[in-house]
Amino acid sequence: MSGRGGASGIPDYLQMPLGRFLEALSSGEPAPGGGAAAAVSVAMAAGLAAMAARLSSAGELAERADALREEVAPLARADAEAFGRVLAAYRLPRGSEGRRERIEEALGEAAGVPLEMARIGAEVCRLAGRLALEGNPNLKGDAVAGALLAEAGVRAAAELVEANEPEGERALEARRFVEAARRAREKMAQGGG
C-alpha cells in the first residue's frame, strides 16, 4: 500500500514516512488533525510498551501491546474519514431534507472513533505503567514515556469526543477513560502504591 488516498481519498497515514505525516499534520488541510495525532500517539505508546515488555521477558504483555497498537493505528485514518463525513453533512444545503439528521449521524460517528482511541489508550497507559514498575529497570524510561504518550492520546481523544458530542453517554465515557489513564499514571509515579 502507498501513502496515497484510498477510496475515501484519505491517505493511509500508516504507510507515510513520518516526515510526510508531520507535514500533512501541519498543512492547511483539515485532516489529518487531532484525531490522527491522538491515534498515532497511542500507537507509539503501545509500541514502546511492547518493546519494554519484550526486553523484560513479558511476552504476554508484549502481545497485548502489539494487539492494541494494531487496533488503534488504523483509527488515524478512520478519524479523518469520519471528519470528512461531518464536513460533507454540513455542506448540504440549509433546510434540505435530512440535513440535520445527517449532521447528527456524522457527528456521532466522529465522536465514536476518538472514543475508541481513548478506550485503547487507557489500557495502553495501564500496561505501560505496569511495565515501568515491574519490567526491566533499564527500560523504565521507555515504559514511562509510553504511559505518558498514552495518557496524552487519551486526553486528546476525549476532547474530540466532547467537541463532537458534548452531551450524552459518550462524553461521560470519554471522561472515565481520561480518569483511568490519570490513575494509571499516578500509580506509576507513586511507585505502584
Language model regions located:
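Conserved, well-structured ligand/cofactor-binding cores
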Residues: 2-193
